[in-house]
Amino acid sequence: MDRIHLTTQLAVQGDVFRAMLSGLTPDQFRWKPAPEKWCALEIICHLYDEEREDFRARLKSVLETPELPFVKIDPPAWVSERKYMTQDFEGILKRFLTERESSVTWLSGLKDPPWSNAYLHPKVGPVNCDLLLTNRVAHDLHHIRQLNNLRYGYLTSISTVPMDYAGTW
């Protein structure tokens, strides 16, 4: 496992989120392709919460106290409980990027951590550090794809011309 590469990817993907989300208008960051789908505002709120309360917290837990159970989280419930749609888009984006930088700094500063540690999850079995770090990178990629689809969907929703010249989506 190339943990340096994965940590670098987290930094790079933070820059990707910054580039994809900076400068969006309220119409753009609130646009949804369907009522049950997430908009960019909900995605960045989710990423902010996940950065602090899921991946980083759980990786820290497995590294330091693998025998203790994970703190329970409920990301789907957070959307309404934390009123994602009422959040300040630019503010939450800035807070997410600050948290991401903190995560990268923390990971980069670890000195000989016990990467072989694993928490024995009662439902999914062993959850080790490499699984958490790799899935953090994969989670970013999932939401980058989701944001790309949102941006394309928004463009097609406001366009008066066909999009097939650009290629098949």
Role assignments for model-derived ranges:
Residues 2, 40, 81-88, 124-128:
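Short amphipathic alpha-helical segments at helix-loop
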Residues 3-4, 16-21, 32-36, 76-81, ...:
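Short amphipathic alpha-helical segments, especially helix-boundary/capping motifs
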Residues 30-75, 104, 119-169:
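Short, contiguous alpha-helical
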Residues 9, 13, 20, 77-116, ...:
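Acidic/histidine-rich alpha-helical segments that form the ligand environment
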